[in-house]
Amino acid sequence: NINPADPRCIPFYECLAHHKLPLLSHTGGEKSLPNINPDVASPALLNEAVRRGVTIIAAHCGTRSAMGETDYVDVFAKMAKDHEHFYGDTSALNLPTRSHAYKTLLEDQEVMKKVIHGSDWPIIPIPPAFRLGLNATAEFFQQPNWLKRDIQIKQRLGFDDDYWNRAAKVLRLKEEVASA
């Protein structure tokens, strides 16, 4: 419920930029936690942080969490294209209300280069049947490990090696940590 455009955040952004620390910020809708203010859901509210030199990871790529909510995936896509250090993660995208974003992410290579893996465990991944078909969807439900299921779905959707390795680059992890 913090508005990222609030001027009181500026010293925090300056500190993050100075120490080259990324900011993971929730974007889009949220129904798994109570009392979320929908007025602070747009990725556009992170413009001041980007302007100050902060690397941003927009959780959920600005997607809605329920029908009827405002969806910001197009705002995310524009910001990802416009700002070198603006990324989004795919956490919880394997939910029926968020999986529509796969079209934007997978079909626009410029945007896809700004997407990193996220799982949002323990949110249960539900395969997007409209993209994978009913047989593949049923097959994925046989996987009892939700983290593995999330990964297998994204692999089947066509997420490439760069996607799986991008978080290590964005988070500036040392090679031995990233490959562990």
Across the structure, where does each feature detected by a protein language model lie?
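Active-site glycine- and acidic-residue-rich loops that bind
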Residues: 1-7, 34-40, 66-69, 93-100
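Helix C-cap/helix->beta junction micro-motif
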Residues: 18-19, 52, 82-83
